[in-house]
């Protein structure tokens, strides 16, 4: 009796959603990823094409950056910058959503800033920079927002080692 092959996450074929198909039809290279637990479509793009794709999605109606954030896949692995976009309109009973992910090499975590498309990215990109060290090129004021200016390292990276001591000077 032949052994049945069951797809694994690495081999499973993900059907492209409407946004991924629209991007592909308009010449924007992307990869459809598995939808999240709420059914939100997720697309992966390269950092070199993030800005043109972000501008195209804005023109396509994704006028609200609900959330920008980052996460670490683990020591020695990629960092991820993600963008949760929503189409907001007066007549939408269920707004369309999409999440765009950019996987960045740990040794060179640079991605263009989307601040010039969605102004709400300002503090969100700063927080992601502060916690993960992802550099948002073209951001007008990329500096720490949560940690002290002289803090060393990126506290939410999985390979981060907490300092034994940090002296807070001129705190009062």
Swiss-Prot record:
Q: Where in the cell is it found?
A: Cellular thylakoid membrane
Which NCBIfam families does this one have?
A: PRK12494.1
Alphabetized InterPro entries for the sequence: NADH_DH_suC, NADH_quin_OxRdtase_su_C/D-like, NADH_UbQ_OxRdtase_30kDa_su, NADH_UbQ_OxRdtase_CS
The domain of life is Bacteria
Q: Which organism is it from?
A: Synechococcus elongatus (strain ATCC 33912 / PCC 7942 / FACHB-805)
Question: Which keywords does UniProt give here?
Answer: Membrane, NAD, NADP, Plastoquinone, Quinone, Thylakoid, Translocase, Transport
According to UniProt, the reaction catalysed is: a plastoquinone + NADH + (n+1) H(+)(in) = a plastoquinol + NAD(+) + n H(+)(out); a plastoquinone + NADPH + (n+1) H(+)(in) = a plastoquinol + NADP(+) + n H(+)(out)
One Pfam family here: Complex1_30kDa
User: What does this chain do?
Assistant: NDH-1 shuttles electrons from an unknown electron donor, via FMN and iron-sulfur (Fe-S) centers, to quinones in the respiratory and/or the photosynthetic chain. The immediate electron acceptor for the enzyme in this species is believed to be plastoquinone. Couples the redox reaction to proton translocation, and thus conserves the redox energy in a proton gradient. Cyanobacterial NDH-1 also plays a role in inorganic carbon-concentration.
One Gene Ontology BP term is: photosynthesis, light reaction
| Name of protein | NAD(P)H-quinone oxidoreductase subunit J
> Recorded E.C. number(s)?
7.1.1.-
GO MF, one example: NADH dehydrogenase (ubiquinone) activity
**Per the annotation, which location comes first and is thus the protein's main one?**
membrane
